[in-house]
Amino acid sequence: MKRKLFLLTAIILSFSLFLTACKQGEIDEAKAKEIALNYVNNMFDANETQASVEQDQTEYYRDETGALVTSGDGNSSLERLYFVRVPEETSIIQYEVAILGSTGEVLYASRGTSSIRLTDAQKKQAEAFYVETSEWEDLHVSAMQSLRQACFDWAKTKLDESRPVVLDANRGEMPGVKQRQFGHSFYVVTRDGRVYSVSMQWPSMQVMSIEVIHAK
Protein backbone atom coordinates (compact mmCIF):
# COMPACT_ATOMS: atom_id res chain seq x y z
CA MET A 1 0.00 0.00 0.00
CA LYS A 2 2.82 2.41 0.90
CA ARG A 3 4.51 1.70 -2.42
CA LYS A 4 1.31 2.46 -4.32
CA LEU A 5 0.79 5.71 -2.43
CA PHE A 6 4.38 6.73 -3.18
CA LEU A 7 3.90 5.96 -6.86
CA LEU A 8 0.63 7.89 -7.03
CA THR A 9 2.32 10.86 -5.35
CA ALA A 10 5.07 10.83 -7.95
CA ILE A 11 2.51 10.71 -10.74
CA ILE A 12 0.51 13.59 -9.25
CA LEU A 13 3.67 15.69 -9.14
CA SER A 14 4.32 14.81 -12.77
CA PHE A 15 0.85 15.92 -13.83
CA SER A 16 1.51 19.52 -12.83
CA LEU A 17 3.86 19.95 -15.81
CA PHE A 18 3.07 16.99 -18.03
CA LEU A 19 1.55 17.93 -21.40
CA THR A 20 -0.75 15.43 -23.03
CA ALA A 21 0.48 15.81 -26.58
CA CYS A 22 -1.22 13.10 -28.60
CA LYS A 23 1.25 10.27 -29.12
CA GLN A 24 -0.54 6.97 -29.58
CA GLY A 25 -4.10 7.82 -28.62
CA GLU A 26 -6.23 5.74 -26.28
CA ILE A 27 -4.58 2.45 -25.38
CA ASP A 28 -5.78 -0.81 -23.84
CA GLU A 29 -4.14 -3.11 -21.29
CA ALA A 30 -2.29 -5.14 -23.91
CA LYS A 31 -0.73 -2.02 -25.41
CA ALA A 32 0.14 -0.66 -21.95
CA LYS A 33 1.95 -3.92 -21.19
CA GLU A 34 3.86 -3.74 -24.47
CA ILE A 35 4.89 -0.12 -23.88
CA ALA A 36 5.96 -0.83 -20.29
CA LEU A 37 8.07 -3.87 -21.14
CA ASN A 38 9.82 -2.00 -23.95
CA TYR A 39 10.50 0.90 -21.57
CA VAL A 40 11.82 -1.33 -18.79
CA ASN A 41 14.07 -3.31 -21.12
CA ASN A 42 15.46 -0.17 -22.72
CA MET A 43 15.87 2.13 -19.73
CA PHE A 44 17.00 -0.50 -17.21
CA ASP A 45 18.89 -2.83 -19.59
CA ALA A 46 16.55 -5.67 -18.68
CA ASN A 47 15.16 -8.56 -20.69
CA GLU A 48 11.63 -8.96 -19.32
CA THR A 49 8.77 -10.54 -21.24
CA GLN A 50 6.00 -10.94 -18.64
CA ALA A 51 4.06 -8.42 -16.57
CA SER A 52 0.74 -7.82 -14.85
CA VAL A 53 -1.47 -4.80 -15.57
CA GLU A 54 -3.76 -2.93 -13.18
CA GLN A 55 -5.99 0.05 -13.94
CA ASP A 56 -6.61 3.07 -11.73
CA GLN A 57 -8.05 6.55 -12.15
CA THR A 58 -7.12 10.00 -10.91
CA GLU A 59 -9.04 13.28 -11.05
CA TYR A 60 -7.48 16.11 -13.02
CA TYR A 61 -8.14 19.55 -14.50
CA ARG A 62 -6.62 21.35 -17.46
CA ASP A 63 -4.91 24.71 -17.00
CA GLU A 64 -4.79 27.49 -19.59
CA THR A 65 -1.91 25.79 -21.44
CA GLY A 66 -3.68 22.45 -21.68
CA ALA A 67 -1.46 20.81 -19.08
CA LEU A 68 -2.86 18.27 -16.65
CA VAL A 69 -3.06 19.53 -13.08
CA THR A 70 -4.56 17.97 -9.97
CA SER A 71 -6.36 21.05 -8.66
CA GLY A 72 -8.13 23.96 -10.31
CA ASP A 73 -11.41 25.56 -11.31
CA GLY A 74 -14.03 24.28 -13.70
CA ASN A 75 -14.96 20.76 -14.56
CA SER A 76 -12.66 17.92 -13.63
CA SER A 77 -12.19 14.66 -15.49
CA LEU A 78 -11.01 11.20 -14.59
CA GLU A 79 -7.81 10.05 -16.28
CA ARG A 80 -7.14 6.33 -16.57
CA LEU A 81 -3.73 5.07 -15.51
CA TYR A 82 -2.17 1.69 -16.15
CA PHE A 83 0.22 0.24 -13.58
CA VAL A 84 2.38 -2.44 -15.15
CA ARG A 85 4.42 -4.61 -12.79
CA VAL A 86 7.22 -7.08 -13.51
CA PRO A 87 7.35 -9.95 -12.76
CA GLU A 88 3.81 -11.13 -12.17
CA GLU A 89 4.72 -14.50 -10.60
CA THR A 90 5.96 -13.11 -7.28
CA SER A 91 4.92 -10.61 -4.64
CA ILE A 92 8.30 -8.89 -5.00
CA ILE A 93 8.01 -6.22 -7.68
CA GLN A 94 11.19 -5.87 -9.72
CA TYR A 95 9.93 -3.18 -12.08
CA GLU A 96 6.90 -0.92 -12.10
CA VAL A 97 5.67 1.49 -14.79
CA ALA A 98 2.79 3.98 -14.76
CA ILE A 99 1.27 4.83 -18.15
CA LEU A 100 -1.32 7.44 -19.14
CA GLY A 101 -4.26 5.62 -20.70
CA SER A 102 -5.29 8.41 -23.09
CA THR A 103 -1.92 8.75 -24.81
CA GLY A 104 0.30 5.80 -23.93
CA GLU A 105 2.82 8.13 -22.30
CA VAL A 106 5.09 6.70 -19.61
CA LEU A 107 4.79 8.86 -16.50
CA TYR A 108 6.96 6.96 -14.07
CA ALA A 109 9.12 3.84 -13.96
CA SER A 110 11.03 2.24 -11.11
CA ARG A 111 12.99 -0.86 -10.24
CA GLY A 112 13.36 -2.70 -6.96
CA THR A 113 16.67 -3.12 -5.18
CA SER A 114 16.40 -6.88 -5.67
CA SER A 115 17.24 -6.33 -9.34
CA ILE A 116 20.60 -4.74 -8.45
CA ARG A 117 23.70 -6.92 -8.22
CA LEU A 118 26.92 -5.31 -7.02
CA THR A 119 30.21 -6.42 -8.50
CA ASP A 120 32.99 -7.56 -6.15
CA ALA A 121 34.74 -4.23 -6.71
CA GLN A 122 31.58 -2.31 -5.82
CA LYS A 123 31.10 -4.38 -2.66
CA LYS A 124 34.64 -3.52 -1.53
CA GLN A 125 33.97 0.12 -2.37
CA ALA A 126 30.81 0.10 -0.26
CA GLU A 127 32.57 -1.47 2.73
CA ALA A 128 35.45 1.00 2.54
CA PHE A 129 32.98 3.87 2.35
CA TYR A 130 31.12 2.61 5.42
CA VAL A 131 34.13 2.18 7.73
CA GLU A 132 35.91 5.43 6.78
CA THR A 133 35.63 8.12 9.47
CA SER A 134 38.09 11.00 9.18
CA GLU A 135 37.57 11.64 5.47
CA TRP A 136 34.00 10.43 5.15
CA GLU A 137 32.57 13.74 3.94
CA ASP A 138 35.24 14.05 1.24
CA LEU A 139 34.55 10.48 0.14
CA HIS A 140 30.84 11.24 -0.02
CA VAL A 141 31.46 14.28 -2.22
CA SER A 142 33.59 12.16 -4.52
CA ALA A 143 30.90 9.46 -4.63
CA MET A 144 28.30 12.09 -5.50
CA GLN A 145 30.43 13.37 -8.36
CA SER A 146 30.79 9.87 -9.79
CA LEU A 147 27.04 9.31 -9.42
CA ARG A 148 26.27 12.53 -11.28
CA GLN A 149 28.61 11.48 -14.07
CA ALA A 150 26.86 8.10 -14.25
CA CYS A 151 23.52 9.91 -14.59
CA PHE A 152 24.97 12.10 -17.35
CA ASP A 153 26.27 9.07 -19.24
CA TRP A 154 22.95 7.26 -18.84
CA ALA A 155 21.01 10.26 -20.14
CA LYS A 156 23.24 10.52 -23.21
CA THR A 157 22.59 6.89 -24.09
CA LYS A 158 18.99 6.33 -23.04
CA LEU A 159 17.46 9.74 -23.74
CA ASP A 160 19.21 10.25 -27.07
CA GLU A 161 20.72 13.52 -25.89
CA SER A 162 24.35 14.42 -26.61
CA ARG A 163 24.51 17.21 -24.03
CA PRO A 164 21.99 16.67 -21.23
CA VAL A 165 21.86 19.13 -18.36
CA VAL A 166 22.06 17.24 -15.05
CA LEU A 167 21.03 19.17 -11.94
CA ASP A 168 21.31 17.98 -8.35
CA ALA A 169 17.79 17.57 -6.97
CA ASN A 170 19.08 17.19 -3.38
CA ARG A 171 21.83 19.78 -3.47
CA GLY A 172 23.75 20.05 -0.20
CA GLU A 173 22.08 17.05 1.40
CA MET A 174 24.16 14.31 2.97
CA PRO A 175 23.08 11.11 4.76
CA GLY A 176 22.72 11.57 8.51
CA VAL A 177 24.57 8.31 9.11
CA LYS A 178 27.22 6.37 7.24
CA GLN A 179 25.79 3.98 4.69
CA ARG A 180 27.23 1.29 2.47
CA GLN A 181 24.83 2.28 -0.29
CA PHE A 182 22.81 5.43 -0.84
CA GLY A 183 20.49 6.96 -3.39
CA HIS A 184 20.36 10.42 -4.89
CA SER A 185 18.11 12.22 -7.36
CA PHE A 186 18.92 14.44 -10.32
CA TYR A 187 16.92 16.53 -12.75
CA VAL A 188 17.81 15.84 -16.37
CA VAL A 189 16.92 18.45 -19.00
CA THR A 190 17.29 17.88 -22.73
CA ARG A 191 17.66 20.48 -25.47
CA ASP A 192 14.20 19.73 -26.85
CA GLY A 193 12.58 20.58 -23.51
CA ARG A 194 12.11 17.19 -21.89
CA VAL A 195 12.55 17.14 -18.10
CA TYR A 196 13.07 14.03 -15.99
CA SER A 197 13.66 13.30 -12.33
CA VAL A 198 16.12 10.41 -12.17
CA SER A 199 17.01 8.55 -8.98
CA MET A 200 20.41 6.83 -8.92
CA GLN A 201 22.03 4.38 -6.50
CA TRP A 202 25.66 4.32 -5.37
CA PRO A 203 27.91 2.30 -5.75
CA SER A 204 26.00 0.29 -8.37
CA MET A 205 25.62 3.49 -10.44
CA GLN A 206 22.24 2.17 -11.55
CA VAL A 207 19.07 4.14 -12.24
CA MET A 208 16.35 3.24 -9.74
CA SER A 209 13.48 5.43 -10.95
CA ILE A 210 12.56 7.75 -13.80
CA GLU A 211 9.81 10.34 -13.47
CA VAL A 212 8.73 12.21 -16.59
CA ILE A 213 8.13 15.79 -15.44
CA HIS A 214 7.77 17.34 -18.89
CA ALA A 215 7.46 15.39 -22.12
CA LYS A 216 8.14 16.55 -25.68
Where are the regions that the model predicts?
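Cystatin/cathelin-like cysteine-protease inhibitor module
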Residues: 103-109
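C-terminal motif of bacterial Sec signal peptides marking the signal peptidase cleavage site
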Residues: 17-21
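Positively charged n-region of N-terminal signal peptides that target proteins for export
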Residues: 1-5
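Short, non-transmembrane alpha-helical segments in secretory-pathway proteins
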Residues: 24-66, 130-173
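Acidic/histidine-rich, surface-exposed loop or edge segments in extracytoplasmic proteins
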Residues: 109-137
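Hydrophobic membrane-insertion alpha-helices, especially the h-region
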Residues: 10-14
